[in-house]
């Protein structure tokens, strides 16, 4: 009974937190110029080498449907979420580090690319990607039957005994994500999901305090199981 109650409390608290963040993001977006999907597509396909901005399609695939397991699929991800991530790859000033870094704090290729992007670039390419359809025929899927039950348990109910909330509370039961803040994980590469959870856990990805707290209470086996399960959601 106590475990069931804890699960409800955690899920309810996270849902409220998600709603607050979403509302804040929408409010902050008010008054900004409307993003241009056509310009975003041009940058996505061609890049801008004069500023060190590589063509996004090289790593993230046609229409944001990546076929490279370590590179995320970005098709139909929330616009606000994508803009925030691009910002987080950049350092706020010369004395600080980006809040999104690779293993052991190393800067990723995205840090160099984001440094060459303007605010308009970020908004345009994010808007373009948010409108792209997911290619479900080539999307990643669950492949590990032996961890399916464990992954499903964590996704739907979390690990209340360790304070790990249900992933579904913010990423939705079907993995579609939450508009404005939380990404789609359905069809995402499990290797990428697992890597990000480990980066949250280590603190090398420092742009999500709530995710750090969650990942810090998960074992490698937990991470592998729920990452594979999430990939298979539709």
Residue ranges and their predicted role:
Residues 14-28:
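C-terminal segment of classical bacterial N-terminal signal peptides
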Residues 41, 53-56, 71, 79, ...:
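Disulfide-stabilized extracellular ectodomain repeats and their linkers
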Residues 35-95:
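The feature marks the first
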Residues 78-89, 189-201:
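Short microdomains enriched in Cys/His and/or Lys/Arg
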Residues 67-75, 89-132, 137-141, 178-184, ...:
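Axial heme c-ligation environment in periplasmic c-type cytochrome domains
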Residues 1-15:
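Bacterial N-terminal signal peptides that target proteins for export
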Residues 27-50, 131-160:
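Electrostatic cytochrome c docking/interface patches
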Residues 40, 53-63, 125, 164-174, ...:
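The canonical Cys-X-X-Cys-His
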């Amino acid at each position: 009974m106590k475990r069931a109650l804890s699960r409800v409390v955690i899920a309810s608290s996270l849902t409220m937190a998600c709603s607050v963040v979403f509302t804040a993001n929408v409010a902050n977006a008010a008054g900004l110029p409307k993003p241009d999907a056509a310009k975003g597509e041009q940058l996505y396909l061609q890049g801008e080498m004069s500023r060190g901005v590589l063509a996004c399609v090289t790593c993230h695939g046609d229409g944001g449907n990546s076929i490279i397991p370590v590179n995320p699929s970005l098709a139909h991800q929330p616009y606000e979420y994508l803009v925030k991530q691009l910002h987080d790859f950049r350092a706020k000033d010369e004395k600080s580090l980006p809040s999104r870094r690779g293993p052991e704090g190393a800067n990723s290729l995205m840090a160099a690319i984001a440094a060459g992007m303007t605010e308009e670039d970020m908004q345009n390419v994010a808007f373009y990607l948010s409108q792209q359809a997911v290619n479900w025929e080539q999307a990643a899927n669950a492949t590990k039957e032996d961890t399916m039950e464990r992954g499903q348990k964590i996704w739907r109910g979390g690990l209340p005994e360790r304070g790990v909330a249900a992933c579904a509370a913010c990423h939705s039961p079907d993995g579609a994500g939450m508009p404005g803040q939380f990404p789609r994980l359905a069809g995402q590469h499990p290797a990428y999901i697992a890597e990000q959870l480990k980066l949250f856990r280590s603190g090398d990805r420092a742009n999500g305090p709530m995710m750090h707290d969650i990942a810090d209470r998960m074992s490698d086996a937990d991470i592998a199981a729920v990452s594979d399960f999430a990939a298979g959601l539709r």
